[in-house]
Amino acid sequence: MSEAFDCAKCNESLYGRKYIQTDSGPYCVPCYDNTFANTCAECQQLIGHDSRELFYEDRHFHEGCFRCCRCQRSLADEPFTCQDSELLCNECYCTAFSSQCSACGETVMPGSRKLEYGGQTWHEHCFLCSGCEQPLGSRSFVPDKGAHYCVPCYENKFAPRCARCSKTLTQGGVTYRDQPWHRECLVCTGCKTPLAGQQFTSRDDDPYCVACFGELFAPKCSSCKRPITGGSGGGEGAGLGGGKYVSFEDRHWHHSCFSCARCSTSLVGQGFVPDGDQVLCQGCSQAGP
């Protein structure tokens, strides 16, 4: 008598039948499938021993059931995305859920590098500076009326330009004759001393510090021969630095220098008598030589 060779579950003889050997013993094919096979998450049928089984996120599928839920394309050898537990091929996912690039109008594929700003989406290689047309990537940019500029292009296009060097002012600066200047560009035409924050004047639109303007253009005091910085014209006036002066005919004096050539009495606001290159008070003039 031959030794018994039965299925470990149904106890039916396996002689002459197909069976599957396991650690716990041999099983006929139906018992093996009922005992060990996984249930397909799509069709809810057992995945038999002779079926190709696919596994994704704790779920098991027949190869034929592993499909895009929209177009039914097999995903066995295709890239796919899971959205709300549903499997979608990349094409269907992009159509349903992906954004369109605001520049080229093409779909921004899942996993691709993209940039989002102001509710819009771009491929990384499509987000370009409106000036130089170079990719902005992670660089700083300035939005302007729907355009986007890298900082150098924005400054070159929109920033004010210095009246002296014509280069853009990116920060600070001063205003002279209603025009912007770099602080370092507003210097005395004579000695090149910076004039920002200092008192200065101009001649023929060129700025000068008080000292250079006096040396170059101001009339000289008839007494001390030093320059008088201020306005021109007869009578009394105020110099550029606030110092007062006196003019008579073609001669000029500092207030402190306008005095009688003999007795040194100040003649400011007093009557005086010219005597050649000198001026005398009335008393000294009447006293004679």
UniProtKB/Swiss-Prot annotation:
Gene Ontology molecular functions: actin binding; zinc ion binding
Any one GO CC term of the record: Z disc
SMART domains, per database record: LIM
Residues modified as N6-acetyllysine: K157, K244
UniProt keyword annotations, A-Z: Acetylation, Activator, Cytoplasm, LIM domain, Metal-binding, Nucleus, Repeat, Transcription, Transcription regulation, Zinc, Zinc-finger
Tissue-by-tissue expression: Expressed in myogenic progenitor cells (at protein level). Expressed in skeletal striated muscle and the heart. Expressed to a lesser extent, in lung, and kidney. Expressed in skin and skeletal muscles such as the masseter, tongue, tibialis anterior and plantar muscles.
CDD domains linked to this entry: LIM1_FHL3 (cd09423), LIM2_FHL3 (cd09427), LIM3_FHL (cd09346)
Zinc finger (C4-type): 7-31
Subcellular location: Nucleus; Cytoplasm
Chief localisation class: nucleus
Top-rank taxon: Eukaryota
Any one of the GO BP annotations: actin cytoskeleton organization
Domain LIM zinc-binding: 40-92, 101-153, 162-212, 221-275
InterPro entries in alphabetical order: LIM_FHL1/2/3/5_N, Znf_LIM
Assembly and binders: Interacts with SOX15; the interaction recruits FHL3 to FOXK1 promoters where it acts as a transcriptional coactivator of FOXK1.
Role this protein plays: Recruited by SOX15 to FOXK1 promoters where it acts as a transcriptional coactivator of FOXK1.
Protein name (Swiss-Prot/TrEMBL): Four and a half LIM domains protein 3
